[in-house]
């Protein structure tokens, strides 16, 4: 059976109080609307149409890479009107259409599959996704017939006293037979106080036409929508719990899951240990046997096997196996750190390559540089890469020893097996095997202090 989907993503989200369209707010590193699209795709629904409205271009820009189509809702005239705007998408199709909202990122592919199968197996023309909650106040109630099929949906304000006791609510997600939906949409009107077209009225139309309507009850958290920053935080907490549980099941030790923040696209291999306060974002990959001590942030980076990181920031970079980083190191984008390297405290690396077995132990800046293997950077070494207009490159060969408080003024090359004396400012090439000394000769003025005090 052919299945397609319509995704409602045209709402303004005024309660978010944000210039960003509501559906583009991120949950664990991914836009809410893209969470739903990805769940639909995992449920084998490839043909997805996204309804966009105000700030349509922003939503299109963030979703078009997922090969979806778009329909436009220029005026916000209700959920039924939004689906009416997608009629062109539905015309000529036979099968079923799932309708979901772009602000409900917790929906899973498993639930979507179950909904579609339940709808088709029972021969329903429409199926509502519902939840049963202890406090249904404010939600539309689902009334069922004796055979379990849906009789109608009643909004909270229209419920009678007995109907208010019903705890099954409409989750605002549906599956329809496409032809039955198109026929119902043609009969949909806006004869109500708000002058809007409601998708819930389609259920009433189907029932009047003698069509079968079913309901599938699922866990409430999967259907949670986001209309405020508070709800966004609640949804993020649930998603984070899911993500951390997945990593725990896959053999990762997370010392305190409630205080560990891992984006949905992060990959962590088994036998790694994550301490509290770590933030892993983007497409970061943590290989086997790594230890992330508390309070590091790693973004879009690849961390190879057996790396130890403490209290550091790593952005868009690669860290080789058996390397240690931190505490308080800053690895900036486009850096490649080799294997068995030591990047110590208060070290900043920017757009540089550091060779295997090199040690940069403390208080050092390396920018726009190529550093070879088995080098040692003394405390306070600075690569002076910026002349006020342009960045320049520094090349340091293999087996180079740089003393404390040295400056390498770019562009400059320090060749293999050479030494730089402490306190030197290097502006010219250092030959292979040479000792470079670039500092003033020490002068001791005898009795200088006594003479100063006598003045």
Swiss-Prot record:
Question: A biological process (GO) annotation for this entry?
Answer: cell morphogenesis
**Catalytic reactions on record:** alpha-D-glucosamine 1-phosphate + acetyl-CoA = N-acetyl-alpha-D-glucosamine 1-phosphate + CoA + H(+); N-acetyl-alpha-D-glucosamine 1-phosphate + UTP + H(+) = UDP-N-acetyl-alpha-D-glucosamine + diphosphate
Give its localization.
Answer: Cytoplasm
| SUPFAM superfamilies, sorted | Nucleotide-diphospho-sugar transferases, Trimeric LpxA-like enzymes
Give the record's cofactor note, including how many are bound. Binds 1 Mg(2+) ion per subunit.
Q: What is its EC number?
A: 2.7.7.23, 2.3.1.157
Cofactors that this protein relies on:
Mg(2+)
Task: Please provide one cellular component term from the Gene Ontology annotations of this protein.
Answer: cytoplasm
Q: Where does Mg(2+) bind?
A: 103, 227
Q: Where is this region: Linker?
A: 230-250
For this UniProt entry, the molecular function terms from Gene Ontology, in alphabetical order, are: glucosamine-1-phosphate N-acetyltransferase activity; magnesium ion binding; UDP-N-acetylglucosamine diphosphorylase activity
The ranges of region (Pyrophosphorylase) come to 1-229
Asked if Magnesium is a keyword of the record, the answer is yes
Instruction: Give the record's pathway.
Output: Nucleotide-sugar biosynthesis; UDP-N-acetyl-alpha-D-glucosamine biosynthesis; N-acetyl-alpha-D-glucosamine 1-phosphate from alpha-D-glucosamine 6-phosphate (route II): step 2/2; Nucleotide-sugar biosynthesis; UDP-N-acetyl-alpha-D-glucosamine biosynthesis; UDP-N-acetyl-alpha-D-glucosamine from N-acetyl-alpha-D-glucosamine 1-phosphate: step 1/1; Bacterial outer membrane biogenesis; LPS lipid A biosynthesis
Q: What EC class is this?
A: transferase
The residues the record assigns to binding acetyl-CoA are 385-386, 422, 439
Q: Which NCBIfam families match?
A: glmU, PRK14354.1
> Assembly and partners?
Homotrimer.
**Name of the protein this chain belongs to:** Bifunctional protein GlmU
